[in-house]
């Protein structure tokens, strides 16, 4: 089965995160109808990471707006299910990729995306 553009973009985002020192703990984790692309440890912080992929259609990067309630539901469910995780800060990141051409894209990492415009 051939990988889609989104699949390739998510692999690229995962590589970026790992190079930045993130330890990927989960990929495509879901609870009910809520889903998050990655859950990772970033120097002791638990990061819930949503990926946004957009073709270069003249509109630029995908919207960085996040669904606070969905993020919080996911975090609560994950922490409840994984009680062995030590106390740590939790944050919500958005990583956006703008596809420019086959194999080329721009990446933007918005750390702690819920802290802006709350």
Language model: regions and residue ranges:
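Acidic active-site catalytic centers that drive phospho-/nucleotidyl reactions
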Residues: 10, 37, 50, 93
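Active-site metal-binding core of divalent-cation-utilizing nuclease and nuclease-like domains
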Residues: 19-46
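Active-site donor-binding loop signature of nucleotide-sugar glycosyltransferases
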Residues: 29, 51-53, 112
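Conserved catalytic cores of phosphodiester-cleaving nucleases, focusing on short active-site segments
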Residues: 38-58, 71
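Domain-level recognition of nuclease-like catalytic cores that cleave nucleotide substrates
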Residues: 82-118
